[in-house]
Amino acid sequence: IGKPARNVKRADALDYLAGYTVCNDYAIRDYLENYYRPNLRVKNRDATTPVGPWMVDVADVPDPSQLKLRTWINGELKQEGSTADMIFDIPYLIEYFSSFMTLQPGDMIATGTPEGLADVVPGDEVVVEVEGVGRLVNRIVSESEFFAARGKRKTRGKQHDQALDQRPGSR
């Protein structure tokens, strides 16, 4: 979002954008408890939403409703779609969100993913590409590896870390 947006009409929505970037909004499905419960533990984990590698100015993307979206895991194409296939397009999302909250400059709206969700495990390389915007590349690491690399061991102790390392696909 490029300027404060409140009660924006769909026809004016793109005027409130600063630009576009690539976002890979991971879900840690190990923690999915129930469809009807808030999925705070599923979506809001340290380092589970990489963004970038840059932002493309809104003027440099003439038609955001016709962009190809692709995801590769370890070089294998897993998702291919288009922003034309989105259930809710960007103008709708801005109109809807701004109807009950003020969007501020710097706010981001993640729009979802094409068909074809796939599980990833530590060691996998994931590449997400939005045509005309960029390509985001990241490597999946285990939670214990993530904290160890930053010198911040979890305070839950050795037993917890061992349990994390023994989960399927954690090595």
Please report, for each region that a protein language model flagged, where it lies by residue.
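N-terminal accessory regions of nucleic-acid-interacting proteins
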Residues: 6-20
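Short, structured patches in soluble enzyme cores that scaffold and shape functional sites
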Residues: 1-3, 21-26, 55, 73
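Short helix-loop capping/hinge motifs at secondary-structure junctions, enriched
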Residues: 5-9, 60-63
